[in-house]
Amino acid sequence: MREVLILLIRFYRRFLSPLKPRTCRFHPTCSAYALEALERHGAFWGSYLAVRRVLRCHPWNPGGLDPVPVLFPPGKVRGGAE
């Protein structure tokens, strides 16, 4: 499942993202954040983090540096295994 989600994000980045202006308020961008979250935390928690991030990316949020958490959920030892 994680691989399918990663392919969808890569499709978005390759074909859809160039058609619109750069509007992401965060670093890394929301799509880069989603890829890293999926690779680090697997399909379920990575998707959860990515959706939360996209919902925060709006004109009323100041944005800024927002890295993917190393441990998520708190106390999780390793990422990627589901």
Curated annotation (Swiss-Prot):
Cellular localization per UniProt: Cell inner membrane
Pfam families annotated for this entry? YidD
Q: Which UniProt keywords apply?
A: Cell inner membrane, Cell membrane, Membrane
Among SMART domains, the record links this protein to: Haemolytic
Task: Name the InterPro entries for this protein.
Answer: Membr_insert_effic_factor_YidD (IPR002696)
Bilayer-crossing residues are none
Name the source's superkingdom.
Bacteria
Q: Which family does it belong to?
A: Belongs to the UPF0161 family.
Q: Which NCBIfam families does the annotation name?
A: membrane protein insertion efficiency factor YidD
Q: What is this protein called?
A: Putative membrane protein insertion efficiency factor
Species the sequence originates in: Thermus thermophilus (strain ATCC 27634 / DSM 579 / HB8)
